[in-house]
């Protein structure tokens, strides 16, 4: 089955509104055809409205980096999925290892967030990935599989078919280390196999699975050549306009 590649830049806690606007203006008119590849930026909350405004009329998709599982209430500091939808956001990244590690988010939190995101007409990008210790112990498939199953519990086949799963080995995020092509393929296939076991092969064949972890313009084509890698969630290499555009060159 043909799945459209999706390259998403995750800015993390970088860029002020002025810098964000300049970036979007620099890339918006230079993107490859959206028939070939989907391109997106996950912007921090304080620049999101600026980025959405700057991206209007372009094919660039915009994601939030987090949202809560309630639409409103006494949840100081959280982002409402309802308001994100009203603003025009397309995607929400949830379950990133930094959120799990620093902010103690659980698989159950991520599952509740996924349901709230879908309830508001948005699409989640659900992150999963193992630590170096888990990887070296040979337990990566088991660990990541449990993360994926828990995150997707209770979702419909239609919902799962449309979401994105980003496999990011924690030991490769921002470290300069990157998984081998075989590692990326094997783990992204393992993610798809979990979806197939839980929701059926037809659903699994529609799910887009991204690889993330020190992806750069120099290695993105290698990963994109893998049959079960449908895109990339990219950190550092997405912070400069030229580098972000270069990540999309693999379609040429």
Swiss-Prot record:
Main enzyme class: isomerase
EC nos: 5.3.1.1
Catalytic machinery residues: 96, 168
CDD domains registered for this protein in UniProt: TIM
Subcellular location: Cytoplasm
Function: Involved in the gluconeogenesis. Catalyzes stereospecifically the conversion of dihydroxyacetone phosphate (DHAP) to D-glyceraldehyde-3-phosphate (G3P).
NCBIfam families (alphabetical): tim
Record protein name field: Triosephosphate isomerase
Organism this protein belongs to: Streptococcus agalactiae serotype V (strain ATCC BAA-611 / 2603 V/R)
């Amino acid at each position: 089955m043909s799945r459209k590649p999706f390259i998403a830049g995750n800015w993390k806690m970088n860029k002020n509104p002025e810098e964000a606007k300049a970036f979007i203006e620099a890339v918006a008119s230079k993107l490859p055809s959206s028939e070939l590849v989907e391109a997106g930026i996950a912007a921090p909350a304080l620049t999101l409205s600026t980025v959405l405004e700057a991206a209007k009329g372009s094919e660039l998709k915009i994601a939030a980096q987090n949202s809560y599982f309630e639409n409103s209430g006494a949840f100081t500091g959280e982002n409402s999925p309802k308001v994100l939808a009203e603003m025009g956001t397309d995607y929400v990244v949830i379950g990133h290892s930094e959120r799990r590690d620093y902010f103690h988010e659980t698989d159950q939190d991520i599952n509740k967030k996924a349901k709230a995101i879908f309830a508001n007409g948005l699409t989640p990008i659900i992150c999963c990935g193992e630590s170096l210790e888990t990887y070296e112990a040979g337990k990566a498939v088991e660990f990541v599989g449990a993360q994926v199953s828990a995150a997707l519990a209770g979702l419909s086949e239609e919902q799962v078919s449309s979401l994105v799963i980003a496999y990011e080995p924690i030991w490769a995020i921002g470290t300069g280390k990157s998984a081998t092509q075989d590692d990326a393929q094997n783990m992204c296939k393992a993610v798809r196999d979990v979806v197939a076991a839980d929701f059926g092969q037809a659903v699994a064949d529609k799910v887009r699975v991204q690889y993330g972890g020190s992806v750069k313009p120099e290695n993105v084509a290698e990963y994109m050549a893998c049959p079960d890698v449908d895109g990339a969630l990219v950190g550092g290499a997405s912070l400069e306009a030229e580098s972000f555009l270069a990540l999309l060159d693999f379609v040429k």
